[in-house]
Design a protein with these regions (language model features):
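Amphipathic alpha-helical polymerization modules
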Residues: 2-241, 245
Length: 246
């Protein structure tokens, strides 16, 4: 009778171990699928924005879960003490999503209101959200235009800021607008303002806001930018770079 109970117990234990192993295998496969789906989403977004002015591609890293140690509880062979029986891996997970800040290619547009930055830095934008809250955001997209009041604005109508932090106001009757490599703006040869171009000590302290804009988070430290302003150009992401994470 005792031997039968022991046999049944052993069978039950083996069945439980098989089911446990099957579940672990399914979970490992699941985490792999989740990782690949995230990578596909990122690459698809990069490709969709390959011609978006000032867009910076994203990438993802993969890392394995920490190993889990298996323990046999109250092992009779060692005085009913817990016994380590090995370790197992539960697959991989997304480590982090990062953004590449490499310089993109410049495309000539011959528009006096298109500007591309060569080097590190961002245009400063006064952005008002749907709740009516206004804050300073940043962009690499220099496709601007002049509104009816003479202010330099983004394609969405947000004000472009000068180095003083105020919106850039242009004379509406000016026939020629020129900008030098430092970002100084001239209308018919007369100085008007200078682009408020800023850079950051650590890009880990800026995050994507949406609409091709970025915002500084707590701890962000700004610094002067040495970026060169190119009038009549826009900055694009290389299409091949957009897909090189595949």
């Amino acid at each position: 009778m005792i031997s039968v109970i022991t046999y049944k117990t052993a069978v039950n234990i083996n069945s439980q171990e098989k089911r446990s192993g099957m579940v672990r295998g399914l979970y490992t496969a699941y985490t792999g699928l989740v990782n690949q789906q995230k990578r596909l989403d990122v690459v698809s977004n990069n490709l969709a924005n390959a011609t978006t002015t000032g867009f910076k591609k994203e990438g993802v890293t993969t890392q394995s879960f920490d190993s889990v140690y298996g323990i046999k509880i109250k092992d009779a062979t060692v005085g009913y003490m817990n016994q380590n029986i090995g370790s197992m891996s539960l697959g991989a997970k997304i480590g982090e999503t990062y953004r590449s800040w490499d310089q993109g290619s410049l495309r000539n547009t011959d528009s006096n209101y298109d500007f591309a930055l060569s080097g590190k830095g961002f245009f400063s934008i006064s952005f008002t959200n749907k709740a009516g809250e206004t804050s300073t955001l940043y962009t690499r997209d220099g496709s601007f235009q002049m509104n009816q009041e003479g202010y330099l604005v983004t394609k969405d109508g947000d004000y472009v800021l000068g180095e003083s932090g105020d919106p850039i106001l242009l004379p509406t009757d000016a026939s020629q607008l020129s900008v030098d490599s430092t970002g100084a703006i001239y209308a018919d040869g007369q100085y008007v303002d200078t682009f408020g171009i800023v850079d950051f000590e650590d890009y880990d302290y800026i995050e994507a806001y949406g609409e091709n804009l970025y915002r500084a988070v707590d701890g962000a430290v700004t610094k002067d930018s040495d970026a060169v302003v190119n009038q009549g150009y826009i900055c694009l992401l290389y299409t091949s770079d957009a897909a090189d994470d595949k």
